Each structure stands twice: as C-alpha cells, then as structure tokens.
Swiss-Prot record:
GO terms for molecular function: ATP binding; catalytic activity, acting on a protein; histidine-tRNA ligase activity; transferase activity. It catalyses: tRNA(His) + L-histidine + ATP = L-histidyl-tRNA(His) + AMP + diphosphate + H(+). The lineage of its organism: Bacteria, Bacillati, Bacillota, Bacilli, Lactobacillales. This is Histidine--tRNA ligase. It holds the Pfam family tRNA-synt_His. Keywords: Aminoacyl-tRNA synthetase, ATP-binding, Cytoplasm, Ligase, Nucleotide-binding, Protein biosynthesis. It is found in: Cytoplasm. It comes from Streptococcus pneumoniae (strain JJA).
Amino acid sequence: MKLQKPKGTQDILPAESAKWQYVEGFAREIFKRYNYAEVRTPIFEHYEVISRSVGDTTDIVTKEMYDFYDKGDRHITLRPEGTAPVVRSYVENKLFAPEVQKPSKFYYMGPMFRYERPQAGRLRQFHQIGVECFGSSNPATDVETISMAAYFLKEIGIQGVKLHLNTLGNPESRAAYRQALIDYLTPLKETLSKDSQRRLEENPLRVLDSKEKEDKVAVENAPSILDFLDEESQTHFDAVRQMLENLGVDYIIDTNMVRGLDYYNHTIFEFITEIEGNDLTVCAGGRYDGLVAYFGGPETAGFGFGLGVERLLLILEKQGVALPIENALDVYIAVLGDGANVKALELVQALRQQGFKAERDYLNRKLKAQFKSADVFAAKTLITLGESEVESGQVTVKNNQTREEVQVSLETISQNFSEIFEKLGFYTQ
C-alpha cells in the first residue's frame, strides 16, 4: 500500500506555509488592536458540545461530523467549528466571573474537521480564524466586530467584498417568523428538494439558504423576517444599520441569509466576493445571546465570526494578490575545504545569535553550486570562507545584489555584523 495523506487533507509545504504565517500574524496584529486575546481549545470535544449547540438537525451534525467512541466509550467528535468549543471553555473556566473584565474578547486559530466533498477552498481538515466577544448586548459590539472583519479583509488585500446583513430577531420574533414560513412552505412541500422537505419539518429557516434550484424558486416570494420583528428586535437592527452607515461600511440587506448554525439570533452577516462567476463567502458570523446559558452559564450576550484560511488564500490567489512575504537570507556562507568547516559553524551561529537569518553550506560542494544556493535563498550578503581566510582571520563580505565588497575580520563578524551589514547598504531592525 502506498502511504498517502487522507482524502480531503493537504500538506502545507514551506512555500505555502509562509503565506499562512503571514495571514495568521496579520490577524493577530489586527485583533490585538481591538483588545482580543488568544484562546486555544482541544481539537476534539464531547459530541454533545457540538450537537446540542450547533443543532441536531443541521447538516454539520447530521452529515459532516467526524465522531467516534473512544476506548472509555465516550462519544467524541473532532471540532467542526470554533464557537461552541470557545463557549464551552468560557463557561467551564468561569470566565463570566465578576473579576473578569467585560466584554471578554477572544480569538482562536486552528484546524476544524468536516466530512464533506473536497473541492477548491473546502477540505475535510480546514483551518479557521475566529473571534468571540462575550458580555455585551450593545449593538455597537455587533458593528465593531463586523467593521474589524471588514478592515482585516481590506488590509489583507481581498477585493470586491460585499457585506450581506440580516437579523433573526430575538426568540419571540424568530418563533413568529418560523410559523409564517411553515405556513408558506407547507403547500409547496412537494416542489422542494428532499433535503428541504426534511428541513421544513426540523428547521424551516434552513430552506431559505438552500443552494438547490427548486428551493430557490420556492422561496422567491417567502415572507421576510423583517416583517416579524418585535420592537426590541427592530430597535437593535436599526441601531446596527445606523452605526454601520456612520462608519462608512456599506451593506446589503439579505433576508434569505440565515447561516448554517442554530445558535444565532439578532444580527447575522457574511462577507461575500465573486470569483469566476461564483459567490464565495470569505467571513461570516453573528450574535448568539443564548449560547452561554445553554452551556450552563449565566445569561450572557455573545457575538463573533469565523473565516476559512484556505478559502481566504484561494481568493487572494485568484485575485492576483501577492502577500508581502520576506524569505530572503541575510547572510550565506560559502565554505571551501574541510579546514573551514568548524569556523563556518562558529560564524553562522554567531550571526544567528545577533539576530541575522543565516545559512552555510554543509555538503562540500564546488563554489559555483554554493553561489547558486545563495541566489536561490535570495541572500543579501555572501561570505566565502576557506582555509586561507581561517588562517588570516580576514574575510570578504559581498553585497550579493550590487557586488560591492568589504574586507573585515572574522572577529568583527562574530561580534558586530550589523555595522558591516549597514555599510553594504542594508538596514537592521
């Protein structure tokens, strides 16, 4: 048997992982400005953590979860999304306690798992970056979080992004709308897809965002959630819209957008961009004020979003956006002869300990091959170290771009290379 990676997974090799590191680092910097702190949860959870919060009737739970019984006969699932594990952690660790500052803001990054048909930008092991904010029902929290996502997408370089906005109202408004939707769809049941016929019985709102052609036709004249909002829900949604407008964030009201998870209420949103004629959601989220209490904590407001890293990178690639990744070596040491081997090791270590990105040859190759390696690594400077240089204690350092050279002592390189580096036209941080 040929050993290969499982279907729906990928190896992220160095050329690609540099892009991942850039995106993750960029997100950390943005989140830090908004006072978010990182939380890391297990990649597997008890089955009930996901099934009860995400919803027993959702596609995630009924079709896509990786779940199994461990050796202790515990029902375990690999996490398919990030919010439920963070809420579980928030409650379990009593982060709702009075001494914890509110709102409490967390972000997470890591792998998620769903058993679905692999395709471009959608894998069975995929990676999410997300944020969760607990303790504020203020609509300004909705808007701050949405605008943070908009800022991140703009600054990372995603083009043509449109914000789709909707509300699911409070539980009372949602219940009234649910009944109206059942009344509307029941006479049309036989025209719906098999999945949507099931959804009509279990969670009729999910029919609204079905991708099946017959379902899209059926919901064209469906009632709008906006007609069933009570005063509280309407006031919250109006405030969100007004604040977005005050911040200059454009949006589209999309009453057929309901999101694929059952825990949302009030504001929900998606950032969508068009790629090759297809609408791709790059970031999505919303408010979930009942989820903390559902996990056994006190009544606590919540708001958050998640974005898929694979899809983000796919969109950047399709849009021709080159991330500003710096992979160049500061120094490459070409080594000539066995007598220079030990000194080359000492020198490259000294350079690294001064903060320089440095590499040397270990393979006793001809100089031409070593110089080619320096070019492949885009080395800014080149040092050729042979037995004669070791004996004299003097070496030539060359700017590998301009070919300018300086003669310096090995001791100077070992103790203060930054002075030489700057003399050759480069700057140290």
